[in-house]
Amino acid sequence: MSQQAVKFAYWVPNVSGGLVVSRIEQRTDWGIDYNRKLAQLAEAAGFEYALTQIRFTAGYGAEFQHESVAFSHALLAATSQLKVIAAILPGPWQPALAAKQLATIDQLTNGRIAVNIVSGWFRGEFQAIGEHWLEHDERYRRSEEFIRSLRGIWSQDNFTFRGDFYRFDNYSLKPKPLGRPEIFQGGSSRAARDMAARVSDWYFTNGNSVEGIKAQVDDIRAKAAANHHSVKIGVNAFVIARDTEEEAKAVLAQIIDQADPEAVNAFGDAAKQAGRASPEGEGNWAKSTFEDLVQYNDGFKTNLIGTPQQIAERIVALKAVGVDLVLAGFLHFQEEVEYFGQRVLPLVRELEAKAQSARTAEVA
């Protein structure tokens, strides 16, 4: 188990519809006023990161979508310590533009911007905005070149790069970022994991059981070690923390009972089609059931559903298999982020301290 405290991030609801494809009431709003307050509450609660979403088209409840980089900057302006991860989609974005945008925001916010490189899974979105749709592994090859380009632009003067997708000739960006913005990515395919093991600082996995997550962590870390690279792991989880386990399970049942079948099935078809395009025929949602797909990132599978004590124990179990960060979604963001900070996070820190004391005693 890592001696570093597990970190916490939350999904920013900068698109409408919340994080579940359900008709259940979600006391969550996609507007900037709601999100500014949410960012401040999350910062006070002990969250280190917030992750904005990137969507160009409506679908599956997300009728309205704020652009991720501009929205990230607005949240950074409303906080003082929170790091915000801006989602960027290669294709619509070019590395030079992204590098300059992020370097400027980094300068303006004392180094608190990070980036999530989204390789793309929704073919219809690319077609709608006139972007060429690459085959599965080609999308990850492009993303890797995008990341290598960002790193080069941020760290070198007269940067020169000859790739299949991007080329630079003696390009110098000034000013550069204050430090090196962290680079995140997701994906469960072989191509995604191999990319993380070569170039990314962080790898997000979809929700899964502790055993399933351990298998992914072990695979990626072994590959990274062979590449003399280090990568940290974040896991998706939809958190339902209530005073009793019965209350939490009842909320989960209500979410699923009130799911929008047409939207869930349409999302599932698009997501699984993207996964089947990988050489191994799998992706993030290959084994997801209808109930799993009600939450976009398989967040129910991680099972952070129950009392604060139960959830804290499960988070520490995730940490024990190599998870460095929990990326949390909620039904009612503001009130539940606050509850999480008051009731769950202190228990996590207490359990971490006990585990550290036990390790110290064993060494002694």
UniProtKB/Swiss-Prot annotation:
A Pfam short name = Bac_luciferase
Which reaction is catalysed here? dimethyl sulfone + FMNH2 + O2 = methanesulfinate + FMN + formaldehyde + H2O + 2 H(+)
* Transmembrane parts of this sequence: none
For the protein in the UniProt heading, the enzyme class is oxidoreductase
- Which keywords label this protein? Flavoprotein, FMN, Monooxygenase, Oxidoreductase
For this protein, the record's Gene3D superfamilies field holds: Luciferase-like domain
User: Which superkingdom, per the lineage?
Assistant: Bacteria
User: Which GO biological process categories is it annotated with?
Assistant: alkanesulfonate catabolic process
Q: Could you say which EC number(s) this protein's record lists?
A: 1.14.14.35
Q: Summarize the protein's role.
A: Involved in the dimethyl sulfide degradation pathway. Catalyzes the oxidation of dimethylsulfone (DMSO2) to yield methanesulfinate, which is oxidized spontaneously to methanesulfonate in the presence of dioxygen and FMNH(2).
Family, per the entry? Belongs to the SsuD family.
Q: What is this protein called?
A: FMNH(2)-dependent dimethylsulfone monooxygenase
UniProt organism field? Pseudomonas fluorescens (strain Pf0-1)
